Amino acid sequence: MASGVAVSDGVIKVFNDMKVRKSSTPEEVKKRKKAVLFCLSEDKKNIILEEGKEILVGDVGQTVDDPYTTFVKMLPDKDCRYALYDATYETKESKKEDLVFIFWAPESAPLKSKMIYASSKDAIKKKLTGIKHELQANCYEEVKDRCTLAEKLGGSAVISLEGKPL
């Protein structure tokens, strides 16, 4: 932990809940998180779950039409964040679901914030074991096009993301 920032237990619990796809009742599935944002605590000592910045599986098709577009809109204009996004995508062979770790560091974020988030990234990644895909973005142009995420998930083999053809 180069920055000395700790990862809160809440972050690890959310990650484990998103990672493990146990057989659940339809009600439990609706409560699963599709996307979450993590931020630094006020004192900059802990990485915590950002309150109210999440999409639940049950929201998709109800209050959320396109989870990826909604997720991109949750990212702040002028500050950094870490995020977990549970991507549902299709290749020519099969349907897949994978967690993607996203490091959001917009160019308009304060330099100090970018430095703390960049130096704390390894700390959070070490705690979130088993993530296959990572995306780092510095502006909305890099995330608003779902092809950027599809490229990370499997390149040209990916034919749709969140049910939307590429």
Curated annotation (Swiss-Prot):
GO terms for cellular component: actin cytoskeleton; cell leading edge; cell-cell junction; cofilin-actin rod; cortical actin cytoskeleton; cytoplasm; dendritic spine; filopodium. The keyword Cytoplasm applies. It is a peripheral membrane protein. A motif (Nuclear localization signal) lies at residues 30-34. The modification Phosphotyrosine is found at residues 68, 140. It holds the Pfam family Cofilin_ADF. The modification N-acetylalanine is found at residue 2. Belongs to the actin-binding proteins ADF family. This is Cofilin-1. It comes from Rattus norvegicus (Rat). The gene is Cfl1.
